[in-house]
């Protein structure tokens, strides 16, 4: 019944297996990839005809982690997988980015790639396995795909690169100072196509070395996919790239000068209007047959690309008149929103971000339910890109894949410089509102986020800045590297290369390459040029932070105290009774973890002190020989019980009440009476022994021996 083909190899410390022919046989291509005991199934289907009038490539990538893969049942009311999590969205983008440029130009049939995590060993991250499975499924499906690709994750510890470090090693790099890198690289046999990383101030040489190491390590995986395809690949889809050379010649003749004049306008809004008008004039000058040609959009885009790119390599000029390595004018302002905890407005040319920081307590941490376990995050970064930022009308709703991806890039860049939670026990939420956009808005979020957190009083290890780089690579090998690219330069260039970091090194690197031929030398030069741009931006940012910002008066204060773990139950009380009383009486928030660390939070310092004193009274031990003020709570024939230390009671024996014989303790005491007592010690059973007669009941001072003898 089944015609199963399996290919296996040793990859690093694990075994990698590719299998096809048993499951989902009606899909155009299905491969189950397994690394260790982590398995991902990738399914590829594609339409045999292009939709009429479609002028873009409709590729859709879905990635889903099934809870059963790790032996778990989903939470929530419905107990089933619902909308994609942030991890699933980011992984789908991770797969999409390297495969999209490898489809044959002109192919616009709908393609669907679905990756499903079937098994997770909690050691090997399924995102790399999914990328390999998707590449293999595309390669055997017959779709016009110029792959295969493969991906690998690289760590960096003690000066050594590590292939595919475990999930635990990568879980929270901020708390694991030995592990300084989480880098994912995808590429073909000959070229790197995509880089995504989180780093801890690594040098340009160390980052480039990691990329090179990863590209070397994926070579045997690509060979394994090719070996699988040689035996199982379907007949290639009969597709011939459209020849629109005659149409392009007509478009070029009709409007090259108009398009060149339009792109010479430096103001974005005016340029967009002029480019649109030039296109309308070009279309109007064409024949009716040419106007109805489905490749007209491609011909116009090619003309734009030629005009935009021509001056970059030949003359070193860009559409806004800047030099290739020149950063746009920068303006920074902090503290502009009075009631927020921290705020910054970062403007670079026609790109602007209003970034706001809010400080919260442990109750505000984000709870993340993942396949490899549940955990909390105390640093959140949310990126919003409303339509008005580019002068358009559009949908407003929940964040899309792009917003989630850009927010995560900025998160990676900034979290490397955050203080340790033990030093700064706050939850930090940064929100970047992109108010204007003309390229590299994610890097504006990095710069604005750094300024905003410092304005809020967050003790960052160092300021962070980011810059977006571009590349124009001609067929003869000549190239131009662009610093701080515009939106048009991003769309029509050959590489999008975002670098963020401090003066000391890189904290985040993201690279998407659209063409082959990007050599290590080009990447090295691009990183060097990016460093110069980053240092320039850091210098501009420093002008707005002449002195350390004070902690916002509107932010909660957090006091941390450590209690013995065996005292935690006493602080919480039966059914939470004690801790609820502390919160109600003091007005402060109280958070206790299993290690005995208690965080007390309030904007009111008196509330914090009240809660601190109440907790201290519960967990502190009375000191032998010390004098305390107490209250009589019960009188018995042999003495009186006095509450003297929080909830702790002790016995004052009738012989320790006064220096004379009493018939009954009630002769001098009554319940509710305030008295001064000295802790004499503890009896054999641990019971507290108190004395009143050795303490002056008026002053609270201990009666010295001489005075007692005189009496």
Curated annotation (Swiss-Prot):
<keyword id="KW-0548">Nucleotidyltransferase</keyword>
<keyword id="KW-0963">Cytoplasm</keyword>
<dbReference type="InterPro" id="IPR012162">
    <property type="entry name" value="PNPase"/>
</dbReference>
<dbReference type="InterPro" id="IPR020568">
    <property type="entry name" value="Ribosomal_Su5_D2-typ_SF"/>
</dbReference>
<keyword id="KW-0694">RNA-binding</keyword>
<dbReference type="Pfam" id="PF03725">
    <property type="entry name" value="RNase_PH_C"/>
</dbReference>
<dbReference type="InterPro" id="IPR015848">
    <property type="entry name" value="PNPase_PH_RNA-bd_bac/org-type"/>
</dbReference>
<dbReference type="GO" id="GO:0000175">
    <property type="term" value="F:3'-5'-RNA exonuclease activity"/>
</dbReference>
<dbReference type="InterPro" id="IPR004087">
    <property type="entry name" value="KH_dom"/>
</dbReference>
<feature type="binding site">
    <location>
        <position position="490"/>
    </location>
    <ligand>
        <name>Mg(2+)</name>
    </ligand>
</feature>
<dbReference type="InterPro" id="IPR036345">
    <property type="entry name" value="ExoRNase_PH_dom2_sf"/>
</dbReference>
<dbReference type="GO" id="GO:0000287">
    <property type="term" value="F:magnesium ion binding"/>
</dbReference>
<keyword id="KW-0808">Transferase</keyword>
<dbReference type="GO" id="GO:0006396">
    <property type="term" value="P:RNA processing"/>
</dbReference>
<comment type="function">
    <text>Involved in mRNA degradation. Catalyzes the phosphorolysis of single-stranded polyribonucleotides processively in the 3'- to 5'-direction.</text>
</comment>
<keyword id="KW-0479">Metal-binding</keyword>
<dbReference type="Pfam" id="PF01138">
    <property type="entry name" value="RNase_PH"/>
</dbReference>
<dbReference type="Pfam" id="PF00013">
    <property type="entry name" value="KH_1"/>
</dbReference>
<dbReference type="Pfam" id="PF03726">
    <property type="entry name" value="PNPase"/>
</dbReference>
<comment type="similarity">
    <text>Belongs to the polyribonucleotide nucleotidyltransferase family.</text>
</comment>
<dbReference type="Pfam" id="PF00575">
    <property type="entry name" value="S1"/>
</dbReference>
<dbReference type="GO" id="GO:0006402">
    <property type="term" value="P:mRNA catabolic process"/>
</dbReference>
<dbReference type="InterPro" id="IPR036456">
    <property type="entry name" value="PNPase_PH_RNA-bd_sf"/>
</dbReference>
<dbReference type="GO" id="GO:0005829">
    <property type="term" value="C:cytosol"/>
</dbReference>
<dbReference type="InterPro" id="IPR003029">
    <property type="entry name" value="S1_domain"/>
</dbReference>
<dbReference type="InterPro" id="IPR036612">
    <property type="entry name" value="KH_dom_type_1_sf"/>
</dbReference>
<dbReference type="InterPro" id="IPR027408">
    <property type="entry name" value="PNPase/RNase_PH_dom_sf"/>
</dbReference>
<dbReference type="GO" id="GO:0004654">
    <property type="term" value="F:polyribonucleotide nucleotidyltransferase activity"/>
</dbReference>
<dbReference type="InterPro" id="IPR012340">
    <property type="entry name" value="NA-bd_OB-fold"/>
</dbReference>
<dbReference type="InterPro" id="IPR015847">
    <property type="entry name" value="ExoRNase_PH_dom2"/>
</dbReference>
<dbReference type="GO" id="GO:0003723">
    <property type="term" value="F:RNA binding"/>
</dbReference>
<feature type="binding site">
    <location>
        <position position="496"/>
    </location>
    <ligand>
        <name>Mg(2+)</name>
    </ligand>
</feature>
<dbReference type="InterPro" id="IPR004088">
    <property type="entry name" value="KH_dom_type_1"/>
</dbReference>
<keyword id="KW-0460">Magnesium</keyword>
<protein>
    <recommendedName>
        <fullName>Polyribonucleotide nucleotidyltransferase</fullName>
        <ecNumber>2.7.7.8</ecNumber>
    </recommendedName>
</protein>
<feature type="domain" description="KH">
    <location>
        <begin position="556"/>
        <end position="615"/>
    </location>
</feature>
<feature type="domain" description="S1 motif">
    <location>
        <begin position="625"/>
        <end position="693"/>
    </location>
</feature>
<dbReference type="InterPro" id="IPR001247">
    <property type="entry name" value="ExoRNase_PH_dom1"/>
</dbReference>
